């Protein structure tokens, strides 16, 4: 049932109550309620609330005879407050919407209307989520973090808010907070998306470590990235770092995983040639031959591979 129909029916109840009170007073109450209903239909929520509050005051002055009328007005007032809040949300006037929802809850609880109060409470996390999304899109990470944290405060298991909070933390350089948010999101229905973000996060950290010359950290972060979601580029970074550390076994392992995940990579021939050379350095003749043969016909690496094959096959 639409809000307009609900208000109309409530107004009808007001009219039905007219016969039990003094004609003059009840007519004033009906007129005020009618004005409120008309204002509501025109979207003049503030005027509608004032009119129904006026009608309520008249009803309450009638004592026992005005109880039904008063209850009708209270229900109408609560519903108008909620409709006002929803209209502000629709208009993306989110701060005003939050303030109006707070009023809705206060008024509804004061009038004993638990249902409307609960409806308003359910909307608050949605409004904060909308605020967070708007801030994230505008690259206002501080605003996004604040809004998403409010969502989580009200709805701790909201996987979407946790995931986007992780994105905001990551974009603002708050690495540990981003990891914590993503991991909590993964535990709340967003496992695939969260693990993808975690893998990317640690891959970027591995890239930063490579630029800083911290090769052991490169390997650690690349492997951490792959613990969430295997990524060919993470293995390539780890292989590069292992080669600089002169750890041939690790370098071979990582390069082989890289080619396993990305067999048609543009640098596949070069990586295969490197693997062959590393096996050759380690004295593994069979593996060296196997890999040199893979690139023996390559325009760039073929001549070098054939030269080494001639040596190895003597």
Walk through the language-model features, giving the residues of each.
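N-terminal leader/linker segments that initiate helical-solenoid repeat arrays
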Residues: 16, 20-86, 90-91, 99, ...
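Canonical tetratricopeptide repeat
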Residues: 68-69, 73-76, 83, 123, ...
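Short coil turns that delineate tetratricopeptide repeat
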Residues: 60, 109, 156, 189-190, ...
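Terminal, low-structured helical/coil segments at or just beyond the last alpha-helical repeat
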Residues: 197, 204-216, 220, 266-269, ...
